[in-house]
Amino acid sequence: MLLAASDQSVVSTIRDVVQRWGGNFWIRDQVNWKHEILKWKRDRGTVAHLTMYGQNLPNVIDQLDTDRLMVVVGAEKVPPDLFRLADYNVAITNQPHSEIAALSIFLDRVQKGQELAADFSGRMRIVGNVNEKVGVKRSEPIE
């Protein structure tokens, strides 16, 4: 995760979640977003910008190169340069919606639901249960 702003609470929260629950996820803050996008594209990466002003996801999803995909989600007024730099401006819907909702739906569609069966290597693991919350440490047996 590249964060243009400086927000130590977000950085520490993300790092804590990865440590406890696992996954291949990292975060850097105070980055120059334009520099990072240009660098990504120079390295032959694809940039998908999630925006309600873009092309609808079903119309572009098969064109996305998901091997080297940078997903950009604007958290504030998005500069016009971002629309021009992105290889794809993608809309989950052309109606107002939250950024996290757009990212969640986009990632689910790109991964074709396979992320739902992923098992991460963190210290903790969730065990699905109908009646209660069950979280166990990896060293404990799972029943």
Show where each model-derived region lies.
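Short internal beta-strands
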Residues: 1-7
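Flexible loop residues that form catalytic
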Residues: 6, 52, 94
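S-adenosyl-L-methionine/SAH cofactor-binding core of RNA-modifying enzymes
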Residues: 11-78, 115
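Short amphipathic alpha-helical patches
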Residues: 16, 41, 105, 109-113, ...
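Structural signal for conserved beta-strand scaffold positions within catalytic alpha/beta enzyme cores
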Residues: 29, 49, 90-92, 128
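Short, well-ordered, mixed-charge alpha-helical segments that flank or form enzyme active sites
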Residues: 56-58, 79-82, 98-100, 127-128, ...
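Structured adenosyl-cofactor binding patch, chiefly the S-adenosyl-L-methionine
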Residues: 83-121
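Internal, active-site/partner-interface "lid" segment
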Residues: 113-143
